[in-house]
Amino acid sequence: MVFDSLKNKVGGMFGSEEEEEEEKFLEGFEIKSASNDIIELPDVENIQDLDVTYPLIKPFANAHIFWDDEQEDVIYRIEEPELTEKEEEIFRRLKRAMEKKIDVSLKELNSTDKIVGYLGSRIKEISEELGMTIEKENMKKLMYFVYRNFAGLNELEPLMHDPYIEDIGCSGMEIPTYVVHSKFGSIKTNLI
């Protein structure tokens, strides 16, 4: 009781206000890998009828596998949120500053929650330093891309969460990445 009273008087020294602000800043943001989910994929008799979508990183990234009449081939498209021009500019500024601010190996942070918390605190710090106001919905998208690019494998990260992917291959620059899908075989992706 005495401790609580003292804690309330000195507040910030114990980090509670800071932690609360950080929680509000990241409120509603969560990275959920679908790699452990059981995803039933339909049997398709005619490959040209193939059109299936399933989550990879909820709620940000999905796999969309479909027959493309133009290319006359099956395509594996990673669907992610699109950044507006303004969000892209904010992301570029955050990314440049983050590259200078990250002062810990993300491998040392042994859970997704800790990594998200760490990256979120850096984003909050940077956005305040740069005088940027980031709306909550924009923040979720930006945080996803920061997580994907700093803790993950950039554009390849969603593929790492697909339980059906057996192999990923890229033969060079300006050539599409291919995946070996356990149900649909070798498929060209939209990643170049």
Segments the model singles out, each with a brief description of its role:
Residues 1-32, 108:
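Non-catalytic terminal/linker segments enriched in charged/polar, low-complexity residues
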Residues 35, 51-65, 69-86, 95-192:
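N-terminal "pre-motor" subdomain/linker immediately upstream of P-loop NTPase catalytic cores
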